[in-house]
Protein backbone atom coordinates (compact mmCIF):
# COMPACT_ATOMS: atom_id res chain seq x y z
CA UNK A 1 0.00 0.00 0.00
CA UNK A 2 2.76 2.57 0.78
CA UNK A 3 4.41 1.75 -2.55
CA UNK A 4 1.08 2.25 -4.32
CA UNK A 5 0.50 5.60 -2.64
CA UNK A 6 4.05 6.70 -3.48
CA UNK A 7 3.60 5.63 -7.11
CA UNK A 8 0.29 7.50 -7.47
CA UNK A 9 1.79 10.61 -5.88
CA UNK A 10 4.84 10.44 -8.16
CA UNK A 11 2.66 9.98 -11.25
CA UNK A 12 0.43 12.90 -10.26
CA UNK A 13 3.47 15.11 -9.72
CA UNK A 14 4.99 14.14 -13.06
CA UNK A 15 1.67 14.78 -14.81
CA UNK A 16 1.40 18.22 -13.22
CA UNK A 17 4.94 19.09 -14.24
CA UNK A 18 4.47 17.84 -17.83
CA UNK A 19 1.18 19.67 -18.26
CA UNK A 20 -0.53 16.91 -20.28
CA UNK A 21 -0.49 13.12 -20.40
CA UNK A 22 0.87 13.31 -23.95
CA UNK A 23 3.86 15.40 -22.85
CA UNK A 24 4.42 12.95 -20.00
CA UNK A 25 5.19 10.15 -22.48
CA UNK A 26 7.11 12.40 -24.85
CA UNK A 27 4.40 13.29 -27.37
CA UNK A 28 3.84 16.87 -28.49
CA UNK A 29 0.29 16.78 -29.83
CA UNK A 30 0.24 20.53 -30.38
CA UNK A 31 3.17 20.29 -32.77
CA UNK A 32 1.63 17.32 -34.58
CA UNK A 33 -1.71 19.08 -34.98
CA UNK A 34 0.02 22.19 -36.32
CA UNK A 35 1.41 20.10 -39.19
CA UNK A 36 -2.10 19.14 -40.29
CA UNK A 37 -4.07 21.10 -42.86
CA UNK A 38 -6.89 23.40 -41.83
CA UNK A 39 -9.47 20.93 -43.14
CA UNK A 40 -7.93 18.06 -41.17
CA UNK A 41 -8.01 20.12 -37.99
CA UNK A 42 -11.62 21.08 -38.69
CA UNK A 43 -12.56 17.43 -39.25
CA UNK A 44 -10.90 16.36 -36.01
CA UNK A 45 -12.54 19.02 -33.87
CA UNK A 46 -15.89 18.40 -35.60
CA UNK A 47 -15.75 14.65 -34.91
CA UNK A 48 -14.70 15.18 -31.30
CA UNK A 49 -17.56 17.62 -30.71
CA UNK A 50 -20.07 15.09 -32.12
CA UNK A 51 -18.71 12.40 -29.79
CA UNK A 52 -19.06 14.67 -26.76
CA UNK A 53 -22.54 15.75 -27.85
CA UNK A 54 -23.63 12.11 -28.10
CA UNK A 55 -22.24 11.39 -24.63
CA UNK A 56 -24.11 14.43 -23.33
CA UNK A 57 -27.32 13.17 -24.97
CA UNK A 58 -26.87 9.76 -23.31
CA UNK A 59 -26.29 11.39 -19.92
CA UNK A 60 -29.34 13.63 -20.33
CA UNK A 61 -31.48 10.70 -21.48
CA UNK A 62 -30.32 8.55 -18.58
CA UNK A 63 -30.89 11.30 -16.03
CA UNK A 64 -34.38 12.13 -17.28
CA UNK A 65 -35.42 8.48 -17.30
CA UNK A 66 -33.96 7.93 -13.84
CA UNK A 67 -36.21 10.75 -12.64
CA UNK A 68 -39.16 9.07 -14.36
CA UNK A 69 -38.38 5.80 -12.57
CA UNK A 70 -38.14 7.59 -9.22
CA UNK A 71 -41.40 9.42 -9.88
CA UNK A 72 -43.18 6.24 -10.92
CA UNK A 73 -42.00 4.43 -7.78
CA UNK A 74 -43.24 7.33 -5.66
CA UNK A 75 -46.66 7.37 -7.34
CA UNK A 76 -47.07 3.58 -7.10
CA UNK A 77 -45.47 3.26 -3.67
CA UNK A 78 -48.60 1.67 -2.20
CA UNK A 79 -48.48 -1.12 -4.80
CA UNK A 80 -44.77 -1.61 -4.17
CA UNK A 81 -45.30 -1.93 -0.41
CA UNK A 82 -48.21 -4.33 -0.94
CA UNK A 83 -46.01 -6.71 -2.94
CA UNK A 84 -43.23 -6.43 -0.35
CA UNK A 85 -45.62 -7.26 2.48
CA UNK A 86 -46.98 -10.24 0.55
CA UNK A 87 -43.46 -11.61 0.17
CA UNK A 88 -42.64 -11.20 3.86
CA UNK A 89 -39.22 -12.54 4.78
CA UNK A 90 -38.63 -10.67 8.02
CA UNK A 91 -36.07 -7.91 8.65
CA UNK A 92 -33.15 -9.73 7.02
CA UNK A 93 -35.20 -10.81 4.03
CA UNK A 94 -36.57 -7.30 3.66
CA UNK A 95 -33.04 -5.85 3.72
CA UNK A 96 -31.80 -8.30 1.09
CA UNK A 97 -34.86 -7.59 -1.05
CA UNK A 98 -34.25 -3.85 -0.80
CA UNK A 99 -30.61 -4.30 -1.83
CA UNK A 100 -31.71 -6.47 -4.75
CA UNK A 101 -34.07 -3.77 -5.98
CA UNK A 102 -31.42 -1.07 -5.63
CA UNK A 103 -29.20 -3.21 -7.85
CA UNK A 104 -32.00 -3.33 -10.39
CA UNK A 105 -32.36 0.45 -10.64
CA UNK A 106 -29.98 0.76 -13.63
CA UNK A 107 -32.03 -1.94 -15.36
CA UNK A 108 -35.27 -0.07 -14.64
CA UNK A 109 -33.69 3.09 -16.06
CA UNK A 110 -32.70 1.26 -19.25
CA UNK A 111 -36.25 -0.09 -19.54
CA UNK A 112 -37.57 3.43 -19.09
CA UNK A 113 -35.37 4.58 -21.98
CA UNK A 114 -36.91 1.83 -24.11
CA UNK A 115 -40.37 2.86 -22.92
CA UNK A 116 -40.03 6.56 -23.74
CA UNK A 117 -38.33 5.82 -27.07
CA UNK A 118 -41.34 3.89 -28.35
CA UNK A 119 -40.39 0.24 -28.97
CA UNK A 120 -40.81 -0.44 -25.26
CA UNK A 121 -39.78 -3.40 -23.12
CA UNK A 122 -41.18 -6.70 -21.92
CA UNK A 123 -41.32 -8.39 -18.54
CA UNK A 124 -42.41 -11.74 -19.89
CA UNK A 125 -43.08 -12.91 -23.43
CA UNK A 126 -46.76 -11.94 -23.25
CA UNK A 127 -46.19 -8.35 -22.11
CA UNK A 128 -45.19 -5.07 -23.70
CA UNK A 129 -44.86 -1.63 -22.13
CA UNK A 130 -44.49 1.37 -24.43
CA UNK A 131 -45.68 4.95 -24.76
CA UNK A 132 -47.61 3.74 -27.82
CA UNK A 133 -49.49 1.03 -25.94
CA UNK A 134 -49.32 -1.51 -23.14
CA UNK A 135 -50.04 -5.21 -22.80
CA UNK A 136 -49.59 -5.94 -19.08
CA UNK A 137 -48.96 -9.48 -17.87
CA UNK A 138 -48.15 -11.20 -14.61
CA UNK A 139 -44.71 -10.04 -13.46
CA UNK A 140 -42.23 -11.69 -11.07
CA UNK A 141 -42.85 -10.97 -7.39
CA UNK A 142 -40.36 -8.12 -7.12
CA UNK A 143 -41.88 -5.16 -5.25
CA UNK A 144 -40.47 -2.53 -7.62
CA UNK A 145 -42.25 -4.24 -10.51
CA UNK A 146 -45.50 -3.17 -8.88
CA UNK A 147 -44.74 0.24 -10.41
CA UNK A 148 -44.86 -1.07 -13.98
CA UNK A 149 -47.10 1.01 -16.24
CA UNK A 150 -50.67 -0.24 -16.30
CA UNK A 151 -53.20 0.44 -19.01
CA UNK A 152 -52.14 2.80 -21.77
CA UNK A 153 -53.28 6.44 -21.80
CA UNK A 154 -52.92 8.96 -24.65
CA UNK A 155 -51.00 11.39 -22.42
CA UNK A 156 -48.09 8.94 -22.35
CA UNK A 157 -47.24 10.03 -25.89
CA UNK A 158 -46.01 13.27 -24.33
CA UNK A 159 -43.11 11.27 -22.88
CA UNK A 160 -41.59 11.10 -26.36
CA UNK A 161 -40.37 14.55 -25.37
CA UNK A 162 -37.78 12.84 -23.14
CA UNK A 163 -35.47 11.53 -25.91
CA UNK A 164 -36.24 14.59 -28.03
CA UNK A 165 -35.30 16.80 -25.08
CA UNK A 166 -32.04 14.91 -24.61
CA UNK A 167 -31.24 15.58 -28.25
CA UNK A 168 -32.12 19.25 -27.83
CA UNK A 169 -29.63 19.50 -24.95
CA UNK A 170 -26.95 18.10 -27.26
CA UNK A 171 -27.95 20.51 -30.03
CA UNK A 172 -27.74 23.57 -27.81
CA UNK A 173 -24.35 22.41 -26.53
CA UNK A 174 -23.10 21.91 -30.09
CA UNK A 175 -23.96 25.48 -30.99
CA UNK A 176 -22.21 26.80 -27.89
CA UNK A 177 -19.19 24.64 -28.71
CA UNK A 178 -18.96 26.32 -32.13
CA UNK A 179 -17.31 23.40 -33.95
CA UNK A 180 -19.77 23.00 -36.84
CA UNK A 181 -17.02 23.41 -39.41
CA UNK A 182 -19.06 21.54 -42.00
CA UNK A 183 -21.26 24.63 -42.15
CA UNK A 184 -18.21 26.80 -42.84
CA UNK A 185 -16.95 24.42 -45.54
CA UNK A 186 -20.33 24.17 -47.28
CA UNK A 187 -20.76 27.93 -47.15
CA UNK A 188 -17.39 28.51 -48.82
CA UNK A 189 -18.24 25.94 -51.51
CA UNK A 190 -21.83 26.93 -52.32
CA UNK A 191 -22.14 30.47 -51.00
CA UNK A 192 -25.74 29.92 -49.89
CA UNK A 193 -26.23 30.31 -46.17
CA UNK A 194 -29.60 28.55 -46.27
CA UNK A 195 -28.14 25.49 -48.02
CA UNK A 196 -25.07 25.26 -45.80
CA UNK A 197 -27.09 25.66 -42.60
CA UNK A 198 -29.68 23.08 -43.64
CA UNK A 199 -27.20 20.44 -44.75
CA UNK A 200 -24.74 20.96 -41.90
CA UNK A 201 -27.47 20.89 -39.25
CA UNK A 202 -28.93 17.73 -40.78
CA UNK A 203 -25.51 16.05 -40.80
CA UNK A 204 -24.77 17.14 -37.25
CA UNK A 205 -28.13 15.87 -36.00
CA UNK A 206 -27.92 12.53 -37.82
CA UNK A 207 -24.36 11.83 -36.65
CA UNK A 208 -25.20 12.75 -33.06
CA UNK A 209 -28.33 10.60 -33.11
CA UNK A 210 -26.57 7.59 -34.62
CA UNK A 211 -23.72 7.76 -32.14
CA UNK A 212 -26.14 8.14 -29.24
CA UNK A 213 -27.97 5.01 -30.36
CA UNK A 214 -24.70 3.10 -30.65
CA UNK A 215 -23.60 4.20 -27.17
CA UNK A 216 -26.81 2.75 -25.74
CA UNK A 217 -26.35 -0.58 -27.50
CA UNK A 218 -24.32 -2.28 -24.76
CA UNK A 219 -26.30 -0.97 -21.73
CA UNK A 220 -29.59 -2.01 -23.34
CA UNK A 221 -28.20 -5.44 -24.24
CA UNK A 222 -26.95 -5.96 -20.68
CA UNK A 223 -30.40 -5.18 -19.28
CA UNK A 224 -32.22 -7.60 -21.58
CA UNK A 225 -32.29 -11.37 -21.58
CA UNK A 226 -34.09 -14.08 -19.65
CA UNK A 227 -35.10 -14.83 -16.07
CA UNK A 228 -36.03 -18.47 -16.58
CA UNK A 229 -38.32 -20.65 -18.63
CA UNK A 230 -41.70 -20.10 -20.23
CA UNK A 231 -42.98 -16.53 -20.32
CA UNK A 232 -39.92 -15.16 -18.53
CA UNK A 233 -37.58 -16.00 -21.41
CA UNK A 234 -38.27 -12.51 -22.80
CA UNK A 235 -37.13 -9.78 -20.42
CA UNK A 236 -36.05 -6.27 -21.37
CA UNK A 237 -36.12 -4.32 -24.59
CA UNK A 238 -35.72 -5.09 -28.29
CA UNK A 239 -32.27 -3.57 -28.35
CA UNK A 240 -31.83 -2.68 -32.02
CA UNK A 241 -35.32 -1.22 -32.33
CA UNK A 242 -34.79 0.94 -29.25
CA UNK A 243 -31.37 2.14 -30.44
CA UNK A 244 -32.83 3.06 -33.83
CA UNK A 245 -35.74 4.91 -32.22
CA UNK A 246 -33.45 6.77 -29.82
CA UNK A 247 -31.20 7.74 -32.73
CA UNK A 248 -34.17 9.19 -34.59
CA UNK A 249 -35.64 11.12 -31.66
CA UNK A 250 -32.24 12.45 -30.56
CA UNK A 251 -31.47 13.56 -34.13
CA UNK A 252 -34.81 15.39 -34.26
CA UNK A 253 -34.19 17.06 -30.91
CA UNK A 254 -30.60 17.90 -31.81
CA UNK A 255 -31.64 19.70 -34.99
CA UNK A 256 -34.44 21.54 -33.18
CA UNK A 257 -32.20 22.52 -30.28
CA UNK A 258 -29.38 23.67 -32.54
CA UNK A 259 -31.61 25.81 -34.76
CA UNK A 260 -33.53 27.24 -31.80
CA UNK A 261 -30.33 28.17 -29.99
CA UNK A 262 -28.99 29.70 -33.21
CA UNK A 263 -32.16 31.76 -33.63
CA UNK A 264 -32.01 32.96 -30.02
CA UNK A 265 -28.33 33.87 -30.39
CA UNK A 266 -29.06 35.76 -33.62
CA UNK A 267 -31.93 37.62 -31.99
CA UNK A 268 -29.67 38.70 -29.12
CA UNK A 269 -27.05 39.93 -31.56
Locations of the language-model features?
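Cytosolic juxtamembrane amphipathic/interface segments immediately preceding
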Residues: 33-51, 89, 188-197
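Short, flexible helix-coil linker/hinge segments at the edges of structured domains or between repeats
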Residues: 17-42, 77-87
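Alpha-helical transmembrane segments and their membrane-interface junctions
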Residues: 56-76, 212-225
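Basic, amphipathic N-terminal segments
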Residues: 159-211, 215, 247, 251
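Alpha-helical transmembrane segments and their helix-start/interface "positive-inside/aromatic belt" motifs
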Residues: 3, 44-62, 94-103, 196-207
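Transmembrane-helix bundle segments that line or gate the permeation/cavity pathway
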Residues: 1-27, 58-69, 73
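Short, highly charged, low-complexity non-transmembrane loops/tails of multi-pass membrane proteins
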Residues: 20-34, 185-196, 264-269
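Long, glycine/tryptophan/cysteine-rich extracytoplasmic
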Residues: 1, 82-164, 220-269
Amino acid sequence: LPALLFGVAALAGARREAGTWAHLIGLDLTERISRRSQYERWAGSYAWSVVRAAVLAVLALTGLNALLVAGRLAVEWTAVVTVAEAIGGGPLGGLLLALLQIGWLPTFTAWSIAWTAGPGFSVGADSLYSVFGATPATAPALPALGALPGTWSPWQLLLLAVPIGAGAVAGVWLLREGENHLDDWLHTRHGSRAVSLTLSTLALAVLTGLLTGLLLLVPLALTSGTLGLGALTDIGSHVWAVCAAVAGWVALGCAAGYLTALAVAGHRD
